[in-house]
Structures are given as structure tokens and as C-alpha cells.
């Protein structure tokens, strides 16, 4: 008799911010945080969940300041894409050290470093139980890694985009500034837009809405929270169409 717990998702797209990899550091990658995240992803693989992963690059490069100083936006975005590849390489290595088979695919070709993104191959790898890390965003400037996460989530037919953040979900105001901020448990796409809640940028959010892919926002810094999300526990905030909120 199987003792494997039932889970809410078959295939997910996990979005992690680059800042999450910094831990207590002010820059770069905290090895302890990287190892913990790899172990949490390993738990999902052992549950039989297919995992696609997008990591931001903000821990290594932020283009806003340089853009204000006159740097061309396209150049800055290309540098940001390369930062996500660096994070992807670090995560792939951490997963391999945790005995998890992982592949890194980049939206911009980097022969000898990682694989070029290929939709059909990504699907095949996911079905075979490999973690697939999608790097370099969409491969185009002016699009965020949140947009890349939603795009890849739609392409691989993920059941949801799970966005790991530094807070417990979506609040009615900034919990760092307002101790009385209220955490939402469920929201519709239209409620997020009407209330002007900051979940992700508008291009990414409307992409998810138009393709009816749920978004789950949770605290990646809480150990075990990712596992709780995929097991269907009531943690974080789920955003979807109203008819799906009772499912």
C-alpha cells in the first residue's frame, strides 16, 4: 500500500527571486540557502511532482541604477539575463549534489554552458522526472523573469505558477511598513487588478489570467512551506478565476 501523500499539483512552475538566494548576504548567493532550496525541490521530486524552475537575477545584477545613469535598457536586460544563467548554474549544481537530476535550459544559446531552450525536450525531461531550470528570461529585453515564469508555465502546461517570496502571500498593503496588513487567502485575477495589488508585473499577470493558469504566492523562507503548498495545505495566497477558488 502506497504511503505517498496526495498532492494538489502534477506539474508546477516554481518562480524564485534572485534575492531569495542571497539569504542574509547583501549580494550573491548564500550556499546554505541554495542547499536548503535544493533539498525542498528534491522533496517535490520524491513526491512525483514535475518541477520547472525560473530564478530571477536580482542578487547579481540590477539594471535600474545603470539605466538611470544612461546605460541602454537592452544592454542592461541582456546583463540581467546572464545573471539568471549564473543562478541557474548554481541551482543545477546544488540539485546534482542532492542527487536530483536537473537540466538547465537558456533562452539565449550558450554552447558548452547549458542547453538551448527547446519546448518539446523540456516536456520530455519533465515527464522523465528531471527538474528543468529555465534561464535567460524570455530571451527578449523588456520582459521580466515573472513574465518568463508565466510564459514557461503556460508552455509546459503547468497546473500552477508558484511564486516564492519573502512574505507569506499577498497583503492589502506592504507588511514591512504596515504591521496591521491583512493577508489574502484567495483572490480572483480581477480583484488583484481592481485593488492594484503587487503580485507581479502587469504583462506577466495578464498572461497568466488570459491562459487561466493559477498563481500561488507563498513564503519560500519558511522551511517546509513549498511542500505544504503542493500538498494542498492552506498556506499563502491563491489567485485564479472565481469558479476555481472552491476546488
From Swiss-Prot:
Pathway the protein contributes to: Pyrimidine metabolism; CTP biosynthesis via de novo pathway; UDP from UMP (UMPK route): step 1/1
One example GO MF annotation: UMP kinase activity
Subcellular location(s) per record: Cytoplasm
Disulfide bond sites: none
Amino acids binding ATP: 15-18, 58, 62, 165, 171, 174
Record's keyword terms, sorted: Allosteric enzyme, ATP-binding, Cytoplasm, Kinase, Nucleotide-binding, Pyrimidine biosynthesis, Transferase
Main EC class the enzyme belongs to: transferase
Record's GO cellular component terms: cytosol
Domain of life: Bacteria
GO biological process, one term: 'de novo' CTP biosynthetic process
EC number: 2.7.4.22
InterPro entries from the UniProt entry: AceGlu_kinase-like_sf (IPR036393), Asp/Glu/Uridylate_kinase (IPR001048), Uridylate_kinase (IPR011817), Uridylate_kinase_bac (IPR015963)
Principal place of residence: cytoplasm
Annotated stretches, region: Involved in allosteric activation by GTP: 23-28
Activation/inhibition comment: Allosterically activated by GTP. Inhibited by UTP.
Binding site for UMP: 57, 77, 138-145
Alphabetized Pfam families for the sequence: AA_kinase
NCBIfam families: pyrH_bact
Family listed: Belongs to the UMP kinase family.
Function of the protein: Catalyzes the reversible phosphorylation of UMP to UDP.
Subunit structure, as described in the record: Homohexamer.
Protein's recorded name: Uridylate kinase
Organism (species): Pseudoalteromonas atlantica (strain T6c / ATCC BAA-1087)
Amino acid at each position: 500500500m502506497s504511503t505517498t501523500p496526495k498532492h494538489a499539483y502534477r506539474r508546477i512552475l516554481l518562480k524564485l527571486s534572485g534575492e531569495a538566494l542571497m539569504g542574509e548576504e547583501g549580494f550573491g548567493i548564500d550556499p546554505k540557502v541554495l542547499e536548503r532550496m535544493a533539498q525542498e525541490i528534491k522533496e517535490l521530486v520524491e513526491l512525483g511532482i514535475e518541477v520547472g524552475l525560473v530564478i530571477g537575477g536580482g542578487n547579481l545584477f540590477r539594471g535600474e541604477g545603470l539605466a538611470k545613469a544612461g546605460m541602454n535598457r537592452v544592454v542592461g536586460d541582456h546583463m540581467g539575463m546572464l545573471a539568471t544563467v549564473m543562478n541557474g548554474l548554481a541551482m543545477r549544481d546544488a540539485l546534482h549534489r542532492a542527487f536530483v537530476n536537473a537540466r538547465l535550459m537558456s533562452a539565449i544559446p550558450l554552447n558548452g554552458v547549458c542547453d538551448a531552450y527547446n519546448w518539446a525536450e523540456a516536456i520530455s525531461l519533465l515527464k522523465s522526472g528531471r527538474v528543468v531550470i529555465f534561464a535567460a528570461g524570455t530571451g527578449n529585453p523588456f520582459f521580466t523573469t515573472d513574465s518568463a515564469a508565466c510564459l514557461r508555465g503556460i508552455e509546459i502546461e503547468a497546473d500552477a505558477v508558484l511564486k516564492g517570496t519573502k512574505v507569506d502571500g499577498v497583503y492589502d498593503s506592504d507588511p514591512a511598513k504596515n504591521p496591521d496588513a491583512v493577508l489574502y487567502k484567495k483572490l480572483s485575477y480581477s480583484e488583484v487588478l481592481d485593488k492594484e495589488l503587487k503580485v507581479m508585473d502587469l504583462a506577466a499577470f495578464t498572461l497568466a489570467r488570459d491562459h487561466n493558469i493559477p498563481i500561488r504566492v507563498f513564503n519560500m523562507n519558511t522551511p517546509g512551506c513549498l511542500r505544504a503548498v503542493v500538498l494542498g495545505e492552506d498556506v499563502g495566497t491563491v489567485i485564479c478565476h472565481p469558479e476555481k477558488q472552491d476546488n
